[in-house]
Amino acid sequence: MKLVFLFFIVAVMVSLFVGMTEADKPRFLTTVCQDTYEKCKEQMLKKDKK
């Protein structure tokens, strides 16, 4: 789970540097959040099965 959290922080940092235009920033952040959420959900489902 630490790796996912670290990836999220890095992605946010990158989004701030790359997506400087106001139109791109929310779209990029939304994609990152959805991607991170999906990964977290997968991890939780794997834990539940054990």
From Swiss-Prot:
Record localization: Secreted
Family, per entry: Belongs to the caterpillar 9 family.
Organism of origin: Megalopyge opercularis
Physiological role: Probable toxin.
Free-text tissue specificity from the UniProt record: Expressed by the venom apparatus.
Entry GO MF terms: toxin activity
Lineage of producing organism: Eukaryota, Metazoa, Ecdysozoa, Arthropoda, Hexapoda
Gene Ontology CC, one term: extracellular region
Disulfide bond among keywords: yes
Main subcellular location: secreted
Disulfide bonds: 33-40
Alphabetized UniProt keyword annotations: Cleavage on pair of basic residues, Disulfide bond, Secreted, Signal, Toxin
Name of the featured protein: U-megalopygitoxin(9)-Mo13
Residues in the signal sequence: 1-23
